[in-house]
Amino acid sequence: SAASDVYKRQVQGRLIGGCVDCLVNLLGTTYDKTTGFVEKYKNDGMIWFLESCDLNVMAIRRAVWQMKHAGWFSHVKAFLIGRPAVYGQELMGLDQYHAVWDLLKDYGVPVIMDVDIGHLAPMMPLVCGSYATVQVNGNDISVKMEYL
């Protein structure tokens, strides 16, 4: 039945992420403390949340590629991807979904797209460093954050 085909998933871990436009500019600088945070909480696992404001789909892809190859996604348990400000844009056959999916699918963890985070309303605030339980049921998502 169609009801049994609904995507359902629950995952727990530390929330880390934000606006890709800003994060990629910190990568490799003295302000980049990502690897230390990821290692400190590796037993919890990471739930990365990413969204973009000013980047086009090609720039989003390049930024996520750079984050991936810098080792930021070690110990990842899931990715929450917000709708970018360029929602619906396609450049040379690349859309917002394949810009990230093609790079993140190798981790073998859930990649949840079009999450209500970021620069497009509606937007749900997420607290970096909180311990989260994310539940997905079809198009519905809930995020419970604990401050441990």
Map each language-model feature to its residues.
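Oxyanion-binding "anion nests"
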Residues: 15-60
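C-terminal active-site/capping subdomain that shapes the small-molecule cofactor and substrate pocket
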Residues: 56-148
